[in-house]
């Protein structure tokens, strides 16, 4: 689409979102068409909820996130085919693969293992691999990414090139609870098994999170070498493991419970990453 077309879509979506209390499954015309077109563009990867700028900062296209939210008001519940044993589901969002044949899969160029679930409006780039996992609507999964078994990519989350989300990893979405910006995993990151990154946090390029690291906006991310504390963002090429920090003493005692934190144990630049296995990086 041309820029004027996108500008027109954005204007319609913004106005509709301000008047969302009056929007329902009976709504027709310009609003429905704008929402449906926005979801199609997201599904194709022609637009995305967040884009990295030249200065390294991420710009969030809030109107696209609003289009995703409006779709829940517009779309009725319906039977979704493809359940186990020829059963069905009952939902408002169809599968990305609804109606696909071998031609569509070959053109898309990614691998979709049986029992992976991708909802319409999520984009999956060529050479990505989807094990039995869940990718929610509005998400963007870039080239060469591996979404391993039982991993979850939340609504509108941004997964970079060659990212590996290990088994059971959770990447938070923006819709429930409502977040200002999506959770972002930049290019060439490795997220260890059962780790969680949520609440619009950013893991910068080339970082490695060990198994069971949990990062939200209030999580202290402590650089062991400098003592610096980060919130909401893992610096580039950081190697991060789960840790604890001393807590305040309980009243009348000289002890207190320790509190969880994430610890940057080292920095591994691009050259080091290319020569070192993930397991070696995570060893202290």
Swiss-Prot record:
Gene3D superfamilies for the chain: Hexapeptide repeat proteins, Tetrahydrodipicolinate-N-succinyltransferase, N-terminal domain
Biological process, per Gene Ontology: diaminopimelate biosynthetic process; lysine biosynthetic process via diaminopimelate
NCBIfam families: dapD, PRK11830.1
Pathway the protein contributes to: Amino-acid biosynthesis; L-lysine biosynthesis via DAP pathway; LL-2,6-diaminopimelate from (S)-tetrahydrodipicolinate (succinylase route): step 1/3
HAMAP family, per the entry: DapD (MF_00811)
Record-stated family: Belongs to the transferase hexapeptide repeat family.
Binding sites annotated in the UniProt record for substrate: 111, 148
EC number: 2.3.1.117
Subunit structure: Homotrimer.
Primary localization class, coarse: cytoplasm
Name of the molecule in the record: 2,3,4,5-tetrahydropyridine-2,6-dicarboxylate N-succinyltransferase
Catalytic reactions on record: (S)-2,3,4,5-tetrahydrodipicolinate + succinyl-CoA + H2O = (S)-2-succinylamino-6-oxoheptanedioate + CoA
PANTHER family given in the database record: 2,3,4,5-TETRAHYDROPYRIDINE-2,6-DICARBOXYLATE N-ACETYLTRANSFERASE, ACETYLTRANSFERASE
GO terms assigned for molecular function: 2,3,4,5-tetrahydropyridine-2,6-dicarboxylate N-succinyltransferase activity
Keyword Disulfide bond: no
Lineage: Bacteria, Pseudomonadati, Pseudomonadota, Alphaproteobacteria, Hyphomicrobiales
Subcellular location: Cytoplasm
Keyword Transmembrane: no
Pfam families, per the entry: Hexapep_2, THDPS_N_2
Protein origin, superkingdom: Bacteria
Any one annotated GO CC term: cytoplasm
Keywords: Acyltransferase, Amino-acid biosynthesis, Cytoplasm, Diaminopimelate biosynthesis, Lysine biosynthesis, Repeat, Transferase
Organism whose genome encodes this protein: Brucella suis biovar 1 (strain 1330)
């Amino acid at each position: 689409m041309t820029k004027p077309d996108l500008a027109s879509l954005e204007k319609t979506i913004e106005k509709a979102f301000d008047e969302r209390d009056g929007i329902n499954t009976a709504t027709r015309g310009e609003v429905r068409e704008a929402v449906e077109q926005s979801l199609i563009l997201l599904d194709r990867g022609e637009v995305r909820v967040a884009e990295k700028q030249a200065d390294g900062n991420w710009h969030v296209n809030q109107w696209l996130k609003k289009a995703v939210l409006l779709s829940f008001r517009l779309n009725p519940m319906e039977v979704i085919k493809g359940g186990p044993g020829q059963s069905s589901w009952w939902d408002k969002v169809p599968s990305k693969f609804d109606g696909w044949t071998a031609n569509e899969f070959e053109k898309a160029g990614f691998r979709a293992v049986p029992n992976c679930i991708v909802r319409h409006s999520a984009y999956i780039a060529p050479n990505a691999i989807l094990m039995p996992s869940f990718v929610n609507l509005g998400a963007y999964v870039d080239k060469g990414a591996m979404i391993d078994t039982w991993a979850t990519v939340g609504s509108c989350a941004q997964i970079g090139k060659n990212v590996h989300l290990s088994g059971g990893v959770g990447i938070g979405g923006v819709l429930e609870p409502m977040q200002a910006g999506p959770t972002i995993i930049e290019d060439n990151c490795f997220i260890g098994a059962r780790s969680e990154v949520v609440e619009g946090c950013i893991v910068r390029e080339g970082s490695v999170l060990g198994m069971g690291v949990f990062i939200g906006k209030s999580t202290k991310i402590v650089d062991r070498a400098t003592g610096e504390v980060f919130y909401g963002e893992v610096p580039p090429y950081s190697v991060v493991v789960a840790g604890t920090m001393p807590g305040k003493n309980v009243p009348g005692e000289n002890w207190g419970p320790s509190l969880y934190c994430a610890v940057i144990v080292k920095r591994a630049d691009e050259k080091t990453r290319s020569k070192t296995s993930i397991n070696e990086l995570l060893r202290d």
